[in-house]
Amino acid sequence: MPFNGEKQCVGEDQPSDSDSSRFSESMASLSDYECSRQSFASDSSSKSSSPASTSPPRVVTFDEVMATARNLSNLTLAHEIAVNENFQLKQEALPEKSLAGRVKHIVHQAFWDVLDSELNADPPEFEHAIKLFEEIREILLSFLTPGGNRLRNQICEVLDTDLIRQQAEHSAVDIQGLANYVISTMGKLCAPVRDNDIRELKATGNIVEVLRQIFHVLDLMQMDMANFTIMSLRPHLQRQLVEYERTKFQEILEETPSALDQTTEWIKESVNEELFSLSESALTPGAENTSKPSLSPTLVLNNSYLKLLQWDYQKKELPETLMTDGARLQELTEKLNQLKIIACLSLITNNMVGAITGGLPELASRLTRISAVLLEGMNKETFNLKEVLNSIGIQTCVEVNKTLMERGLPTLNAEIQANLIGQFSSIEEEDNPIWSLIDKRIKLYMRRLLCLPSPQKCMPPMPGGLAVIQQELEALGSQYANIVNLNKQVYGPFYANILRKLLFNEEAMGKVDASPPTN
């Protein structure tokens, strides 16, 4: 439609991950190291999904690159529709003061000014208006279902551009009447949310403004139709998602053999860390060293997933198999970092003034809310964490003293307050013992969560010191486990091939690096 092609973008309010079912059969080979070693050592997988190849690099054509891009785009869109219940298309308006916004406004206004001058000329010129009605007719017809023949015939009859041109040649065309018919038809086809827009159209007197607003409302109706289609498609897509994603990724892999390089490095990093941990355990005095240490594929893969909760999403590229969930994982990681700090602050407060404030749950709840509010946006580059932690410390002292005074008890002395604020501010320092303790306990909880069958019928026990964030951590953990379990179902065969290569072929030839991990 003329000058009204608003840019479409993806609306993603809050991610809502679908519950994933149990591992697919192809993932069963990862369930335990004790399963048949021979099956892992075999070379039954397709060569295109192997993490390494000895053949020379193949020249990739432009068409192959474009085919891969289309497959990746389709895979990403299908995944987003299936797992994000809030996914919808929205119109993104350009900022009014931006150059693009000003240019768009000027060009649009110029078009409608020309149309206004043509319709008010003597004699009037109708050619541009007729073209607009022709486009309106096609849009209205696109809303009809295959069975809507009666309305289809009526629209084609009333908005017959050949007939309208003949009427225009004899100055007998009724532009206002045609516009009224269009508005009436739009009222029959639109969603209830557009009823108010239709009423406003009927109340508009200027014919040029009516046509302008008709196109605006038609744009909204097209967006409504697209979102309705997405909503209708979602249940079917959810049922077919695992097979669809796996097939699409296999197509990408066939076009781009290097499409698993980052994934291989991600898993290899976990293998090296586990081997180093086992080698250190073997050197511990009194440890039995009767046989060569073995790694469980499930343990390696779960540890790889745990690394995603400490991923530097700004500097480090995600594994290819997790690209579709990158935004969700980043959001969970950022939220988890906030929960870690809240747990640290609560633990410090309990250690220092718990004896004084014990039995005051309303105070603990208020302090937690204050911390959560002040820590909002802590993952932004402009956020000064040390300054905010200092502010939380000061506010904590104020709230504690206020509560003590209300109960006629002595307030905290200056030394305790300074110590409390200092410990709060030191949380961000490297190797802080409180942070390390909370981080270790959260990792333990998440590791236990990944070991549960999917879907989770009950949550694992909450480690000590995390009660203050239990509700939020359980919700976050459930979302995280859903992402991981669905990812395992989809990409299980690819992970099996990589682990088969890393844990058996390379281990047998002594190729796995057991040096200390660098990060």
Curated annotation (Swiss-Prot):
One of its GO terms (biological process) is signal transduction. Keywords: Cytoplasm, Cytoskeleton, Phosphoprotein. Residues 1-30 are annotated as: Disordered. GO terms for cellular component: cytoplasm; cytoskeleton. It is found in: Cytoplasm, Cytoskeleton. Signal peptide: none annotated. Residues 17-29 have a biased composition (Low complexity). The modification Phosphoserine is found at S16. Coiled coil: none annotated. PANTHER family: T-COMPLEX PROTEIN 11-LIKE PROTEIN 2, TESTIS-SPECIFIC PROTEIN PBS13 T-COMPLEX 11. Belongs to the TCP11 family. Promotes the migration of muscle-derived satellite cells (MDSCs) during differentiation throught interaction with FMNL2 and therefore may participate in microfilament assembly. Interacts with FMNL2; this interaction promotes muscle-derived satellite cell (MDSC) migration and differentiation. This is T-complex protein 11-like protein 2. It comes from Homo sapiens (Human).
